[in-house]
Amino acid sequence: MAKLHDKYQETVVAELTKKFGYTSVMQVPRIEKITLNMGVGEAVADKKVMEHAVRDMTAIAGQKPVVTVARKSVAGFKIREGYPIGCKVTLRGERMWEFLERLVDIAIPRIRDFRGLSAKAFDGRGNYAMGVREQIIFPEIDYDKIDKIRGMDIVITTSANTDEEGRALLDAFNFPFKK
């Protein structure tokens, strides 16, 4: 089992129950899923780009991503309906906890000029979204084997009802928020 999952069960549940006065353990917010999304607009011109993006995403997430396609044609972007334009992967369970551990302990500290995560990126329902500018912050990515530096979106979906509860949950996992 992942270290953070054990920490959640042993200490975080008790802390949050005490802080917010929950009457049941099931009321305590938990992380439900983590979604990684990589938009690859250049895939319209070159099909190889999508293969590289899928390879990188597979290495980072530990499971194969779903290739997302354009829902409708947009002449300005030179895309047609059905063109592959990105890839996404949803992590749950054990893989989710392992990814969260790597994100907090290894990847986030490797971000260049990092000054803390924005605390304003909550959506009003306790879910947190962040963007990463380069995939090379993850240790699974070999700098010499990548074709291009790409960013991705990381969305952490929680069962929290408010941003305050969501922030308290992520704070308990040592997320480095700006003070």
UniProtKB/Swiss-Prot annotation:
Keywords: Ribonucleoprotein, Ribosomal protein, RNA-binding, rRNA-binding, tRNA-binding. Pfam families: Ribosomal_L5, Ribosomal_L5_C. The gene is rplE. Gene3D superfamilies: 3.30.1440.10. GO terms for biological process: translation. Belongs to the universal ribosomal protein uL5 family. GO terms for cellular component: ribonucleoprotein complex; ribosome. This is one of the proteins that bind and probably mediate the attachment of the 5S RNA into the large ribosomal subunit, where it forms part of the central protuberance. In the 70S ribosome it contacts protein S13 of the 30S subunit (bridge B1b), connecting the 2 subunits; this bridge is implicated in subunit movement. Contacts the P site tRNA; the 5S rRNA and some of its associated proteins might help stabilize positioning of ribosome-bound tRNAs. GO terms for molecular function: rRNA binding; structural constituent of ribosome; tRNA binding. The keyword tRNA processing does not apply. This is Large ribosomal subunit protein uL5. Part of the 50S ribosomal subunit; part of the 5S rRNA/L5/L18/L25 subcomplex. Contacts the 5S rRNA and the P site tRNA. Forms a bridge to the 30S subunit in the 70S ribosome. It comes from the Bacteria.
